[in-house]
Swiss-Prot record:
WD repeats lie at residues 23-62, 82-123, 182-220, 231-271, 290-328, 345-386, 495-525. Gene3D superfamilies: YVTN repeat-like/Quinoprotein amine dehydrogenase. It comes from Saccharomyces cerevisiae (strain ATCC 204508 / S288c) (Baker's yeast). This is Protein phosphatase PP2A regulatory subunit B. PP2A exists in several trimeric forms, all of which consist of a core composed of a catalytic subunit associated with a 65 kDa (PR65) (Subunit A) and a 55 kDa (PR55) (Subunit B) regulatory subunit. Interacts with YND1; this interaction mediates adenovirus E4orf4 (early region 4 open reading frame 4) induced toxicity and is disrupted by adenovirus E4orf4, which remains associated with both CDC55 and YND1. The lineage of its organism: Eukaryota, Fungi, Dikarya, Ascomycota, Saccharomycotina.
Length: 526
C-alpha cells in the first residue's frame, strides 16, 4: 500500500480520558504492531500485556481483544535487588495455525506467549438430565422413612453418553517458553530474527542469541565487559537484527556509536564490526555532551538499507554502506539546548526516546515533550535507478563509502531485487527526483498526497502532533499545518512528565499508535 498521505487525524483513544491521578503501574512502556498491522500489543509498568484487534479494514479502528499478566515483581536474593514487572519490549512472531505468538521481556526474564481462541464447552446431556424416577414398594424391608424403598428406573437401553455443547469462546494466553537466568544486567532490547527461529536479547554489557525452541541455553555473541569494571567507558543501549539478512545485527552504545556485526565472521562479534560514528569537534564538547550523545534507540528501515538512530537532541539517518557520517541529522526539540541544566536536574535528560520507520522505509517519527511527537515525511526517497538518497539541506552531502564492503555484499545484492520493488512502489505519485542542486536540496520535504485536502500547496518537512485529550474533543483545530505550527510553539511551558517515548508505525499504511502516559492514541491518514 502506498504511504504517501500524511494528513494524520485522530482516530481512537484507549484509557482514562478524565483528569485523574495516574497510577504508576498503568504507564504504558511498550507498543508494537504485528507484521500485518491487524493486531496491536501494549505493555505497561505493571507487567500487563493488552492486545487489540482491528475491527474495520477500511478505517483504522481497533477493539480490545484480551489482557494478561505477563510478568510479576520478583526479588533477587543473591543481589538483594527487586526486579520490576515493567514490560520493556514486545515483539510479535508470525502467526501459525490460527494462534499468535509474541515475546515480552522485563529486566531479567523473556517469555514467549501463545495467544489463541479457546472454546468453552459444557455437558449438555447425561443420564441425570431428565431426572430420576422413584418407585414405592409395599414390602417392609429396605424401606425408607416414608415406608417405601427408592430405586432409579434406569434400564440398559436408556443409558446415554454425556454430550458436550459449545458454551462460549474466550481468548487465552499461555506462556510457551521462559528464557531466564542469562542476563546479569537489565535487558534493554529483544529482536526477532528474519529466520523466525532465533532472537537476540541485549543488556548493558552483553548480547545473547537464543533459539526459540531452546529456553535453557543461549550463546553470547557480544561481550563488552572489561576485566576491570573501573575501566568501563560505555554500555549497550539498543540492539536489532537486520530485517532481511539473518546473519547481520547491530547494536548502539552510550558513546553514540552504532556497530554492525556479521555472525558469519566470528562467534564473538566484539571486534570485527563496522562502526557508524560521526566526528564531533572537541571544541563543541561540554558537560552534557556525553549524556546527550548516548543513543537511546536504533532501527533498521524495513528494506534494510537505512538505519535511524535517536539520541536526546537528534535523529540521524545512516546508509549501511557509509559509516563515516550520517546522511541526515534532524534536530529535535532545539528549545532545550539552552535548558540542558534544567533537564539534568529533573533527570529528563536521561529519557530514552524511540525512533521508527514507516512501512515503506521513506519516513521516520519520534517523540518529544508536552505529549508531542514528530513525523518527518519522505526523508528517504529513491530514483528510477533504485539508489536511495536522503533529502537534506546540505548540498555537499556525499553518500558514498568504500569501507568494509565485504560485510554488506548480501545487502547490496538484495537491493536490486526485494528493495527494488518497494522503491518502485514508493515512486508512484511522489517527487522522486535526486537532490542535485542547492535549490532542490533546500526545499522542504513535501507531504505527498496528504497535502491535497486542507494543506494543498503547503510543503511540510515536519509534522508535529499532540497525543493529548485535546485530540478527541469535538472542537476543530484547523488544518494539519496549523495544528503542527501550534504544537511547535512551546514557549517556556514544557511539561517533562508528558513525554512520548513509545509508539509504533503500522507496517502497511500511515497509521500510528502512540503511548501517552496511561493512554493509547491512534492517529491515521486513512
Amino acid at each position: 500500500m502506498a504511504q504517501n498521505n500524511f494528513d494524520f487525524k485522530f482516530s481512537q483513544c484507549f484509557g482514562d480520558k478524565a483528569d485523574i491521578v495516574v497510577t504508576e503501574a498503568d504507564l504504558i512502556t511498550a507498543v508494537e504492531f504485528d507484521y500485518t498491522g491487524n493486531y496491536l500489543a501494549t505493555g505497561d509498568k505493571g507487567g500487563r500485556v493488552v492486545l487489540f484487534e482491528r475491527s474495520n479494514s477500511r478505517h483504522c479502528e481497533y477493539k480490545f481483544l484480551t489482557e494478561f499478566q505477563s510478568h510479576d515483581a520478583e526479588f533477587d536474593y543473591l543481589k538483594s535487588l527487586e526486579i520490576e514487572e515493567k514490560i520493556n519490549e514486545i515483539k510479535w512472531l508470525r502467526p501459525t495455525q490460527r494462534s499468535h505468538f509474541l515475546l515480552s521481556t522485563n529486566d531479567k526474564t523473556i517469555k514467549l506467549w501463545k495467544v489463541y481462541e479457546k472454546n468453552i464447552k459444557l455437558v449438555s446431556q447425561n443420564n441425570l438430565t431428565e431426572g430420576v424416577t422413584f418407585a414405592k414398594k409395599g414390602k417392609p424391608d429396605n424401606h425408607n422413612s416414608r415406608g417405601g424403598s427408592v430405586r432409579a428406573v434406569l434400564s440398559l437401553q436408556s443409558l446415554k453418553l454425556p454430550q458436550l455443547s459449545q458454551h462460549d469462546k474466550i481468548i487465552a494466553a499461555t506462556p510457551k517458553r521462559i528464557y531466564s537466568n542469562a542476563h546479569t544486567y537489565h535487558i534493554n532490547s529483544i529482536s526477532l530474527n528474519s529466520d523466525q527461529e532465533t532472537f537476540l536479547s541485549a543488556d548493558d554489557l552483553r548480547i545473547n542469541l537464543w533459539n526459540l525452541d531452546i529456553p535453557d541455553q543461549s550463546f553470547n555473541i557480544v561481550d563488552i565487559k572489561p576485566t576491570n569494571m573501573e575501566e568501563l567507558t560505555e554500555v549497550i543501549t539498543s540492539a536489532e537484527f537486520h530485517p532481511q539478512e539473518c546473519n547481520l545485527f547491530m547494536y548502539s552504545s552510550s558513546k553514540g556509536t552504532i556497530k554492525l556485526c556479521d555472525m558469519r565472521q566470528n562467534s564473538l562479534c566484539d571486534n570485527k564490526t563496522k562502526t557508524f560514528e560521526e566526528y564531533l569537534d572537541p571544541i563543541n564538547h561540554n558537560f552534557f555532551t556525553e549524556i546527550t550523545s548516548s543513543i537511546s534507540d536504533i532501527k533498521f528501515s524495513p528494506n534494510g538499507r537505512y538505519i535511524a538512530s535517536r539520541d536526546y537532541l537528534t535523529v540521524k539517518i545512516w546508509d549501511v554502506n557509509m559509516d563515516n557520517k550520517p546522511l541526515k541529522t534532524i534536530n529535535i526539540h532545539e528549545q532545550l539546548k539552552e535548558r540542558l541544566s534544567d533537564t539534568y536536574e529533573n533527570d529528563a535528560i536521561f529519557d530514552k526516546f524511540e525512533v521508527n520507520f514507516s512501512g515503506d522505509s521513506s519516513s521516520v517519527m519520534t517523540g518529544s515533550y508536552n505529549n508531542n511527537f514528530m513525523i518527518y515525511p519522505n526523508v528517504v526517497t529513491s530514483g528510477d535507478n533504485d539508489n536511495g538518497i536522503v533529502k537534506t539541506f546540505d548540498e555537499h552531502n556525499a553518500p558514498n563509502s568504500n569501507s568494509n564492503k565485504n560485510i554488506h555484499n548480501s545487502i547490496q545484492n538484495k537491493d536490486s531485487s526485494s528493495s527494488g520493488n518497494s522503491h518502485k512502489r514508493r515512486s508512484n505519485g511522489r517527487n522522486t527526483g535526486m537532490v542535485g542542486s542547492s535549490n532542490s536540496s533546500r526545499s522542504s520535504i513535501a507531504g505527498g498526497e496528504g497535502a491535497n485536502s486542507e494543506d494543498s500547496g503547503t510543503e511540510m518537512n515536519e509534522i508535529v502532533l499532540q497525543a493529548d485529550k485535546t485530540a478527541f474533543r469535538n472542537k476543530r483545530y484547523g488544518s494539519l499545518a496549523q495544528r503542527s505550527a501550534r504544537n511547535k510553539d512551546w514557549g517556556d511551558d514544557i511539561d517533562f512528565k508528558k513525554n512520548i517515548l513509545h509508539f509504533s508505525w503500522h507496517p502497511r499504511e500511515n497509521s500510528i499508535a502512540v503511548a501517552a502516559t496511561n493512554n493509547l492514541f491512534i492517529f491515521s491518514a486513512l
